[in-house]
């Protein structure tokens, strides 16, 4: 795949990519997107700045455009990364694609997040701690999530988020698609992938510096 126009995706998503000036895929996007569009799980090794965000966002948006009853959940280690991801999603959904999203991170107003959740956002992006806060409050429902992204998973485990991630996974239906990305693949990541991913396709790329 040399151009996003070659993808078998909804026309409004193609238009949105063009408006946002996303034309040529990075190596991780060229590898991951066609696999994710087939509904397969992915175990991906990629550094920050290789273009992972679009690699998981394009298949997610395509799925949500086709199926109006589903949600996507993106879990990442830091507020900064979560904010960058939501910015990309907002850029792609601001015109024709009317799919609401919510950013669940610490240090931000809980009331504002509750208001956004009440608007039935279908894309949830957040850090493990704040997502768990909302699960405890019963303000977040994950029962119709069928697309899960774990981004920079090695960092999340290094930061001690394993129990929170495992708790989040209890709230998601057993049958769902998972894309797990990590800069490295130590044994604890492989254990998580064996436990939670279904016959994942393994992909790996080096470093670049794009969203």
How does the language model describe each region?
Residues 9, 56, 66, 87, ...:
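Short, conserved catalytic or interaction motifs in soluble domains
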Residues 1-45, 151:
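Conserved pre-motif I regulatory segment
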Residues 6, 24-25, 74, 124, ...:
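Conserved SAM-binding loop
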Residues 141-210:
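Post-DEXD/H (motif II) to motif III coupling segment of the RecA-like Helicase ATP-binding lobe
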Residues 12-15, 68-136, 144-147, 190-194, ...:
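Conserved nucleic-acid-binding Ia/Ib motif block in the N-terminal RecA-like helicase ATPase lobe
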Residues 43-45, 73, 179:
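Short hydrophobic/aromatic beta-strand immediately N-terminal to the Walker A/P-loop
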Residues 46-50:
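The conserved Walker
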């Amino acid at each position: 795949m040399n151009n996003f126009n070659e993808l078998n995706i909804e026309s409004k998503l193609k238009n949105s990519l063009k408006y946002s000036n996303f034309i040529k895929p990075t190596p991780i996007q060229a590898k991951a997107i066609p696999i994710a569009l087939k509904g397969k799980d992915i175990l991906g090794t990629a550094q920050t700045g290789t273009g992972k965000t679009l690699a998981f966002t394009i298949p997610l948006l395509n799925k949500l455009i086709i199926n109006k009853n589903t949600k996507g959940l993106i879990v990442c280690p830091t507020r900064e990364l979560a904010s960058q991801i939501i910015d990309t999603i907002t850029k792609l959904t601001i015109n024709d694609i009317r799919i609401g999203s919510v950013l669940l991170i610490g240090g931000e107003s809980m009331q504002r997040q509750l208001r956004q959740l009440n608007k039935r956002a279908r894309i949830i992006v957040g850090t493990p701690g704040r997502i768990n806060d909302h699960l405890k409050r019963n303000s977040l429902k994950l029962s119709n999530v069928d697309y899960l992204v774990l981004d920079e998973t090695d960092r999340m485990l290094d930061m001690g988020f394993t129990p929170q991630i495992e708790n989040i996974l209890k709230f998601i239906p057993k049958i769902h698609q998972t894309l797990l990305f990590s800069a490295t693949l130590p044994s604890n990541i492989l254990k998580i992938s064996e436990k939670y991913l279904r016959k994942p396709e393994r992909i790996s790329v080096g470093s670049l510096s794009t969203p």
